[in-house]
Amino acid sequence: MKNWLFIFICFAFFGLSAQSEKSPNFVVVFCDDLGYGDIGSFGHPLIQTPNIDRMAVEGQKWTQFYVADPVCTPSRAGLLTGRYPIRNGMTSSKRHVFFPDSPNGLPLEELTIAEILKPLGYATAAVGKWHLGHLPKFLPGQQGFDYYYGIPYSNDMDSDKWGEYLEQSEDPDYFSNTKFFNVPLIENADIIERPADQTTITKRYTEKAVQFIEKNKAQPFFLYLAHSMPHIPLFVSEEFRGRSKTSLYVDVIEEIDWSVGEVLKALEKNNLDKNTVVVFTSDNGPWLLFKTHGGSAGPLRAGKGTTFEGGQRVPTVFWGPGIVSPGVIDQMGATLDLLPTFASLSGAKIPTDRKIDGYDLSKVLTQKSESSRKEFFYWAFAELHAYRNEQYKVHIKQREAIHYGRPTLELDSPELYDINADISEKYDIAETFPRVVSKLLNKMQLHLKDVQDALPDQLAGRMAKE
């Protein structure tokens, strides 16, 4: 009897050891155009986001988290590669993102999070918006992902009825129609629906994400869940339409929160929650041009398309009950940091043949140590607009809002803001701190020299019309 008891204890011990030594899973929930002020835990008084708020309480709420660029394509390239988009040609002054007539995509020599995790036996999936090249040779399957399901670019593209849509889009209760937009829904490399029924897209993304978790629960996995919402045009399922009794935009956000809850349930149901890191964030700030359909940056200045805080500081939460130490992190971090952080937590190798701009935040997550990110360069449309070091941020170029006919403003003299004391960037203190301005400008010059070997512009090209 004692021998059997001993054997049972040994099996139990080694089983627990194997479980604790298993590489962690990673889930990134990446919203489209979600503003800093659009989440309950980040200050919105009306939007109900109980699942995201739960993540913020049980995990880490990051109040100073940045994206690599204030628009879609370059921001996504930065997250997946850990590199400023200027380095791999994924930002442009001519065309700001990829379009359905774009011949290019994320250069295949770039390495993504999926590609550095694959050698460790990770299953990988990209579900949702891709926007890094829609041609077969640039789809997620060519960038380390085992599975793809989603719309390959923005949900407002491939349309000849933009004018008709815009005439109605400012109505807060306007519910768009699929007929305006001919975007395809792709599974792996095959178009399975066109136009995609966007009223069910958040639900279908969620179903595919949960299926992936269920299918791969016995091995480590990386799930990149990139929602198409709340980028305009706004779509929501019948179940959520009108549920908030506030506006269509709020309905959309609350459906995304439901989606987050379904992902957390799947992890908990399969006993994966204590060995998984879930990141919730956004690709850039809100598209304020669309008013009630465009969200809110809360206390931050401006929104999408700008290098003010509202354009590149995004609501971010890290959750993982067995890995992430709970708390509020009022330090800098960025989506650029996800690649080196996931590499550190998993034991993956970071490429050494190229510059990685991200920092390893793993000790902040596990021990609430001090963040190693002390600076951030604000790029937009292939131009360096601003730079932050510690609490000080200097601007040399600006755009107030994304509007394709509006040029970048070259400032006559630099503007300086103390971001810790002046989160809304209202008070220019450049004249009071000329030495700080000089120091930051020197850093910008060094950075510009550092990116001189960048790949050529990948976004500017157009395919010939048939």
Regions found by a protein language model. Give the residues of each.
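Formylglycine-dependent sulfatase
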Residues: 2, 16-415, 421-466
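Sec-dependent N-terminal signal peptides
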Residues: 4-14
